[in-house]
C-alpha cells in the first residue's frame, strides 16, 4: 500500500505543523533540484513561513534568477493555489493517475482471478516439491558402497574435521552436493534436540555421541566447537569426534573427501535415521576374522577401524559416560525393516556381511553394522553401541589371525573381545597418558579403551597391519570394571 494521504487543510497543531513544514520544505527543494538538473533549467524558490521567516532556494544564483524574472515581459504561465486545486480535481474526475498513490486498493474481479491463479500455482509447486522443500532433489537408491580399506577413497582430513561413520541403514547414494537422505517409507525420526552432550573424561577432545539421529552429510557445516563439546542446536544429528585429529570416514566411491578444516556437519535438513538398541542381551559376540593391510606405515591413509558393539543400557560402572541414562535404549533403533533395506558388501576392499543363520531368521543379514563404525578418537567406554541379541559374523578378505596391534585408523584391537585368550594385564590408570612426541603416523594415534598396549610396539614399524572388525560386548560387569576398561591414550601425528 502507498503512503497515507492527509487532507490538505491547515494543520492546527503547532508542533505537527512545524514538522510537516520542515519535511515538505526539504522535499520541495529536492524536487526543484532534480528538475533543474534533469531539464537544465534555472529555479528560484522563495518561502516565508507563518512567522514570516524567509527560506530560499536557487539552482544557480538567486540574484541572477530574480533579475531575469523582473526583466521578463513575455506572456508566461502563472499558477496559484486555486489553479492547482482545479487541475487536481479535473485529473481525479477524468480517472487519470494522481501524483500520489491511492490509499485504498480496490480488488476487481480480474485481479481476484489473478490472485487465485497465483495461489493455485504456489500450492501445486509445494505439493510437487514436498520431499525436499529446501534442498535440491535427491536421487534415492537402496545400495550403499563404502570402501573402508581403499587407500584412494579414504583419507585423513585436516585437523578439526570430525569422524562420521559410514553406511547407515536404508541410506541413499551420496551425491556431491547432497547428504544421506533416507527414503521416508522405512525410516523413523527420533530427535531429542535438548539431550545433554557428554564430553570425554580424558581432558582432550574425544569421541562424542550427539543426540539421537545418525546422519552422514558431506561438506562443511555446523559442527563441534573447539572445546570438545558439540552444539546440540547446530548439529543435533552428528556422530563425530571433536579432537584435532579426527578422521572423515564417509566417502562415496565417486565423490571427493569432505573439505578439511571444517567439521563434517549438518547442512540444513536432518535425515530421519535412527538405530534402536534392545537392552537385554548379555552374551558376548565372537571376534571376527581380521584383515591384513599391506601398505607402509607412513602412507596408509585409512583402514577398517575396530567396531565394538556394546549397549549403553548396561550399568555404567567404570565407564566414561557415567551420566548416560538407560533411557538411551530407545534412542537408537535398528529394526528389521531398516536393516533389510541394505545389501551386503561383497566386492574386495569392501565390508562383506557373513550370512549368519541367526541374522537370516530375523532378516538382519543385509545390514552392515559397519554403518556404526566408530573410528577416530574414542574415549574410555565411548564405543558406539549396538545390541542385536544375535551372533554377528562379518568376514573380510584376505584372512589373517587377529593380532594385538594398532590399526592404521588409529585404533588398537579390542582385547576385551577375546577374553578367553588374553586376560587384561594392565592395572587401571586413573590419569590419561601424556602426549607422545609429534610426528608419529596415524597408526600410533590412539589406543582403544580396552586393549593392552606395549610401548615397544610403537617403535616397531611394520609394512602390514591387520585391521580387526570386532563386534562384541563385555560379557559381565567384571569386564566392565576390569583394568582393561581404561582411559585412552592420545597421541598427535602430522598428516
From Swiss-Prot:
Pfam family, one: SRF-TF
Keyword DNA-binding: yes
Residue ranges, annotated region (Disordered): 175-225, 242-271, 382-495
Modified how: Constitutive phosphorylation on Ser-400 promotes Lys-395 sumoylation thus preventing acetylation at this site. Dephosphorylation on Ser-400 by PPP3CA upon neuron depolarization promotes a switch from sumoylation to acetylation on residue Lys-395 leading to inhibition of dendrite claw differentiation. Phosphorylation on Thr-304 and Thr-311 are the main sites involved in p38 MAPK signaling and activate transcription. Phosphorylated on these sites by MAPK14/p38alpha and MAPK11/p38beta, but not by MAPK13/p38delta nor by MAPK12/p38gamma.
CDD domains registered for this protein in UniProt: MADS_MEF2_like
Biased composition (Polar residues): 382-394
Residue segments, region Required for interaction with MAPKs: 266-283
One cellular component term from this protein's GO annotations in UniProt: chromatin
InterPro entries (alphabetical): HJURP_C, MEF2-like_N, TF_MADSbox, TF_MADSbox_sf
Residue ranges for the DNA-binding region feature of this UniProt entry: 58-86
Site positions for Cleavage: 213-214, 454-455
Segments of skewed composition (Pro residues): 421-433
Domain (MADS-box): residue spans on this chain: 3-57
Residue numbers bearing the Phosphoserine modification: 59, 98, 235, 255, 347, 400, 441
GO molecular-function terms, A-Z: chromatin binding; DNA binding; DNA-binding transcription activator activity, RNA polymerase II-specific; DNA-binding transcription factor activity; DNA-binding transcription factor activity, RNA polymerase II-specific; DNA-binding transcription factor binding; histone acetyltransferase binding; histone deacetylase binding
Cross-link (Glycyl lysine isopeptide (Lys-Gly) (interchain with G-Cter in SUMO)): 395
N6-acetyllysine carried by residues: 249, 395
Sequence ranges of Basic and acidic residues compositional bias: 455-465, 476-495
Keywords for this protein: Acetylation, Activator, Apoptosis, Developmental protein, Differentiation, DNA-binding, Isopeptide bond, Neurogenesis, Nucleus, Phosphoprotein, Transcription, Transcription regulation, Ubl conjugation
Residues recorded as bearing Phosphothreonine in the entry: 304, 311, 407
Biased segments, Low complexity type: 441-454
Function comment: Transcriptional activator which binds specifically to the MEF2 element, 5'-YTA[AT](4)TAR-3', found in numerous muscle-specific genes. Also involved in the activation of numerous growth factor- and stress-induced genes. Mediates cellular functions not only in skeletal and cardiac muscle development, but also in neuronal differentiation and survival. Plays diverse roles in the control of cell growth, survival and apoptosis via p38 MAPK signaling in muscle-specific and/or growth factor-related transcription.
Record text on subunit structure and interactions: Binds DNA as a homo- or heterodimer. Dimerizes with MEF2D. Interacts with HDAC7. Interacts with PIAS1; the interaction enhances sumoylation. Interacts with HDAC4, HDAC9 and SLC2A4RG. Interacts (via the N-terminal) with MAPK7; the interaction results in the phosphorylation and transcriptional activity of MEF2A.
Full protein name: Myocyte-specific enhancer factor 2A
Annotated gene: Mef2a
